[in-house]
Amino acid sequence: MLPKELLDVRRAKGRIFPKFADERDYELAEKVIEIFKKGLGKKYGNLMKQARKLENAKNFKKVRGFIRVLENHCIEKSCAFDVDSELEPRKVRMLLFEHGFVTSKKERDRVLEYVARYFSTTPETVERAMYADREEELILTKFRPLTPDNLIKLYNLSLLQTTLFNALRLTFWASDRHKEIFRSIKRLGLMYELYEDSGRLMVEVTGAATLLKMTRKYGVSFAKLIPWILRAKNWFIRAEISDFDRLYIMEIDDRIRDLFPDVEERLSYDSTLEEEFARKMQMLGYEVEREPDVVKAGKYAFIPDFAVNLGDKKVYIEIAGFWTDEYLRKKAEKIKSSSIPLILIAREDFGDGGANVKDVILFSRKIPYGEVIKALKRYKPEKKVEGDVVELENFAEVPSEYVIAGKYAVRREIFEEIKREIEVSNPSTLEDIKAILKKYGLGESAIRAFGYRVRWIGLGEAVIERTD
């Protein structure tokens, strides 16, 4: 994206439209690239002096925008700026400033000589090193140029992303690449709504301007979605943008697709939470499917993260990214009214609200799997079960005469009987306690319920310890 001061748009009659670069700006883009080409081995400050010569009252935002895009491209891909100093500037400054404020040239020279002796160098080298890491002092050491056409297209993408940073909401339609787009929405943690309009699946994404906190973080994630939309064969974007306390509408479609690059936005995505969820649920005996297809219900649709198979029925689970109270409340209402078997989970520290929403499982550090299982059971028809030991999945709610032991519900008197037998036998190995549990139809998951835990002391060897 570009800094807000480089936002270059046209506003008229409640509409806003970015002033995209085109073939008329080819020569300007070429000149900016040429400055970087000829700037190898020179200071960044010198490059900027040359670039300012290209500026006038009409094009200064575009010139500076081209430079910013070129710099971003440099940092990511094609060039490098290095410090022109054999000393580390930060250490030099720390040592110089330890001597306090100097009031004369004589004092200044004395401090420089002292620091030079410390680093075994000359005062001139110390003076050069003092601010060698400032932006204007950095040296351009490598540059693989873009073509003017690519620079123009990358600039247009950055300008569009910057225009949309203050969006209240973004509504779009794409003809294809739906799975890529929806996966991006989820991985970026964006607040969204899917609905049908005239046979088309429309997507409405909440903009950063609606949030009271985390605006910058959400806005950057929001911007990263745009390239995924633009890669579709056909697309349409409509945005409501807040600008200087006024609301503007921006509408663009694939008729201007040639103004943008065909780039795939790299997403840094931490899948640890999803991997842990799948692993834990599988350990609890559930069959879990990751990233199932979009689930439609009436005119609405949802992008679940998981599908849990309960016999011949699927229950969907969605872990929300960023959220507000209103967003979660509306989503929960739609789930309820559509009768979709979907469980909504939200992380407290990603929220912009009081987190007081019914029918949403909230968590801070770890997902409360007990609540998830309880919610899953609401979707499973309860069987009439009898027996001393019953698998938990057969109960929607465990009767009071049973005690939960891992994946099992054990009749209370039988539970006490097993507990006494374990205490009398005083097990020391995993095999000792497993033998007792097996007699009653219980597995390893029940061990903790009886006051013991497993400690592995080697490959394939474990001992039993009391938990208290």
UniProtKB/Swiss-Prot annotation:
InterPro entries (alphabetical): Bax1 (IPR008508)
Cofactors required: a divalent metal cation
GO biological process: DNA repair
Effect of residue 305 to A: Loss of 3' nuclease activity
Span list, region Nuclease domain (NUS): 270-372
Keyword Nuclease in record: yes
Annotated spans, N-terminal domain (NTD): 1-146
Example of a GO MF term: DNA binding
EC number of this enzyme: 3.1.-.-
Binding site for a divalent metal cation: 275, 305, 318
Keyword Nucleus assigned: no
UniProt enzyme class: hydrolase
Keywords for the protein's UniProt record, in alphabetical order: DNA damage, DNA repair, DNA-binding, Endonuclease, Hydrolase, Nuclease
Region ranges (C-terminal domain (CTD)): 400-468
Pfam family, one: DUF790
Region Central domain (CRD): start-end pairs: 168-260
Family: Belongs to the Bax1 family.
Self-association state and partner proteins as the record states: Primarily a monomer in solution, forms a heterodimer with XPB.
Note on domains (UniProt): Has 4 structural domains; the N-terminus (residues 1-146, NTD) interacts with XPB and has one nuclease activity, the central domain (residues 168-260, CRD), the nuclease domain (residues 270-372, NUS) has the other nuclease activity, and the C-terminal domain (residues 400-468, CTD).
Function: A dual DNA endonuclease probably involved in nucleotide excision repair (NER). The N-terminal nuclease domain (NTD) of the XPB-Bax1 complex cleaves on one side of a DNA bubble (which presumably mimics DNA damage), while the NUS nuclease domain cleaves the other side, respectively called 5' and 3' nuclease activities. Interaction with XPB blocks the NTD nuclease activity. In the absence of its XPB partner, Bax1 has weak 5' nuclease activity. Binds to and represses the ATPase activity (and probably also helicase activity) of XPB2.
Record-given protein name: Endonuclease Bax1
Organism: Archaeoglobus fulgidus (strain ATCC 49558 / DSM 4304 / JCM 9628 / NBRC 100126 / VC-16)
